[in-house]
Amino acid sequence: MKIVTTVQEMQQITSELRASGKSIGFVPTMGYLHEGHATLLRKAREENEIVVLSVFVNPLQFGPNEDLDRYPRDIDRDENVAKENGVDYLFYPSVEEMYPAEQTTTVEVVKRTDVLCGQQRPGHFAGVATVLMKLFNITVPTRAYFGMKDAQQVAVIEGFVTDFNIPVTIVPVDIVREEDGLAKSSRNVYLSQDEREEALHLYRSLCIAKERIEAGERNPEIITNLVKDYIETHTKGTVDYADLYAYPSLTMVEKVEGRIILAIAVKFENVRLIDNITLTVK
């Protein structure tokens, strides 16, 4: 595995690889890798001749009161996970390398961002789309892999890749969970022991809602209220949102049918956790 820290070298490597006909699987991350990321890397390894992993904590996608400065970082750990999962190139640029001057252009996302995390985190998805536009231009991937834990992010990325005719295939990968159901996340390290137990109720609330839908409930308000009430009863966390939308358009639905997403965000003392399920309802 080769570690690359400059844009120029990474672009030279990937342009030569593509010119020689090699397929490139790209996994963009902010580091502090866990089994969810490893799953993305393994899928990229299965489907491509070359695997590129980026580790970059992108300041553009953090708001003024968010956890940019304390976001967990451990490049030695990330290198080990990368090697264990067959990464060929680890792209590890500094902030100064990625943003050497003040940005004169950003990618403004006008759809799919006014709900869920986009509503709570203004500017977040513009930051995500901007850094991905840069990373796609740097790594020139054949396929790019994203976890469905950030399902809104996946919907936004699919939209902007289509809108800008970016020649990359977006590959969504199912949420990876701990044995007890908690969605794997780099931010889980912020949970206290008691909060870690309470956090299990996030996925349980979604499973209960899924059972109600499968039993025939089609009123979205009843489903979302069920989720909110369950979380508020079983945790000390604050429900940021518990919403149901059509997916991937993220538009309101009057009836639970077609492909839908039921998504939640819950604030604990030192961390905000998200989770979701997507269903196709007939």
Swiss-Prot record:
Record-linked InterPro entries: Cyt_trans-like, Pantoate_ligase, Pantoate_ligase_C, Rossmann-like_a/b/a_fold
Active site (UniProt): 37 (proton donor)
Binding site for ATP: 30-37, 147-150, 176, 184-187
CDD domains in the cross-refs: PanC
Record's catalysed reaction(s): (R)-pantoate + beta-alanine + ATP = (R)-pantothenate + AMP + diphosphate + H(+)
Segments traversing the membrane: none
EC number: 6.3.2.1
Gene Ontology terms describing biological process: pantothenate biosynthetic process
UniProt GO MF annotations: ATP binding; pantoate-beta-alanine ligase activity
PANTHER family on file: CYTIDYLATE KINASE/PANTOATE-BETA-ALANINE LIGASE, PANTOATE--BETA-ALANINE LIGASE
Subunit details: Homodimer.
Function statement: Catalyzes the condensation of pantoate with beta-alanine in an ATP-dependent reaction via a pantoyl-adenylate intermediate.
HAMAP family: PanC (MF_00158)
Protein name listed in UniProt: Pantothenate synthetase
